[in-house]
Amino acid sequence: MAHIVRRGESFCVVYYYTDKDGKRHQKWETFHQETEAERRKAEVEIGKKKSTLIVPGKITVSELMVDFVNLYGERKWGVSTYSSNLALIANYINPLIGNQPIQSINTRAVDKYIQQLRKTESVASQFRRMADRYLTDQNIERIIKVLKCAFGQAVRWGMISKNPFSNAILVKTPYHHRDIWDAATIRKALEACRDAQLYVAMNLSFACSMRLGEILGLTWNNVHIEPDDIAQDNAWLYVDKEVYRARRESIKALGENSVLHIFDSALKKPTATVLVLKKPKTDSSIRKIWIPKTVAYILRHWKECQEKLKVTDHSYEDHNLVLAQPNGRPCDDRVIEKKFAQLKKQANLPNVVFHSLRHSSATYKLKYSNGDLKSTQGDTGHASAEMITRIYAHILDEDRKIGAQRFEQQFYANPDLRSIKPPAPETAQPRIDLNTLIRQIERSPELAGALAAALKNSSK
C-alpha cells in the first residue's frame, strides 16, 4: 500500500508498483500540501486494488499537445479551427505550462494557470492586431476549452486518471451588445455608397443576415433571381460555403479534401496563407434565404455588369463568385472592411464594424416578425434559438412591453371585467393668500369682526 513521508515543507506519497516487464519499483510523488498527498494516497490504494493505477511518467504538456493535434485535431477540426487552435497552443499553452508533466497538472495548478493567463499579454498575428493588451476572458475560455479536450483524450488514452480541466472555474463574461445602425442610418449609408461591390455586400448582409465570409463565398449557381422568381416573391439564395484565409501548413496537415477549392495566389513569391472556399463551421449555417425584390434586382444588375467584364477582359478569372474582384478573383474580407471604413468616414456615420449589419438585420427581422425566433434563426444560421434569445434579448423585452400594453387595452380596458378603478386625481385644496386677506379687511372693517367671530367659534 502507499504511505506519506514528510520532507521539510513537502509531503511525499511512497508506494511500489510493477512495470510491464514484471519488475518491481518504488515511486515517490511530491506534493506541497498534505491534503493533496492524502488524496493521491487514496487514489493509489484504490488504483492498486482495482488494477487501474496509472504511474506518473515524464510526458509533458507540450508532448501531449503534439499527440492531441496529430491524433485528434487532424480528424476532427476544419482548417479555421485547426489554425486558431495551433496558435493558442503555440502562444499561450506551450510557453506557460508546456514543460510541466501532465500528471503534475491538478485542479490547483489549473487555477494558478488561469490566474497567470489573466496577466498574459495578447500575441498579435501577422494579419490581425489585438484590440486588447491582455488576454480577454473569452480567449481564456477558448484556451481552457482546448486543454479540457486534450486532457480528456489523455484520460481516454490511459495517461492520467482524471481530467483536471473538467471543473475549471472561469469568469462568466456578460454579453455586451454590439453597436448597430438603425434603419435610417443604413439607408443613409447605402445612399452615400458609390462603390458597387460594397453596395452589394451591404445589402446582402442586411437583407439576408449573411456573414462576410458567406457573402464572399456566394456563387451564382446558388442565387435564384429569374424574373418569374422575383414576380412570385420567390427569389432566394443558398448558403453552403465561405471564403477563408487559411494557413498552407493547416491545409497540408488536414489534406486538400478539407477545403472545397484553393485559389492560386496572385503573388509570385511564396505565401504562408491562401484564400480557400470551405464549408461553414456548423451545419446550421447551411441554409436557404429568401431575397427581397429590391435586392434581387440589385443582384441582377450586378450580374449584368460582371458579364460585360468577362467579355471585355480576356484575363478575367471566372470562379462564378458573386462578389468577385474586377479581374474575377476572390475578394479578401479586409478589402470590404477597408471600403466600409472609408464610407463611414466620408459619410460621417457612427463607427460600427461591417458584421454589425448582420446584427441590424436580425434585430429588424425579430421586430417585423413579432419575435419569431425560428424564422430569424433560419435566416441567420445560428446553431440554436437560445443564441438568438441571448444576443437579442433586449429586442424581445421591447416586444414584451408592447404585449403588456396590448393586454391592458384588450382585456382590462373593459369596465365589466375590472372592479379595481384607477385612483381619482387629488383635488387641489384652496390656498389662502395672506396679503389679499389683509387688503380685503382694510376695505371692509366689518369683515374683521366676522373673521374674529369665526376664529373664536372654531377654537371652542
Name each model-derived stretch:
Residues 14-17, 267-276, 282-349:
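Active-site/catalytic core of tyrosine-dependent DNA strand-transfer enzymes
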Residues 123-126, 133-137, 141-143, 156, ...:
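Basic, Lys/Arg- and aromatic-enriched nucleic-acid-binding interface segment
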Residues 222-231, 350-351, 370-393, 419-420:
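Short, polar N-cap/turn motifs at the start of nucleic acid-interacting alpha helices
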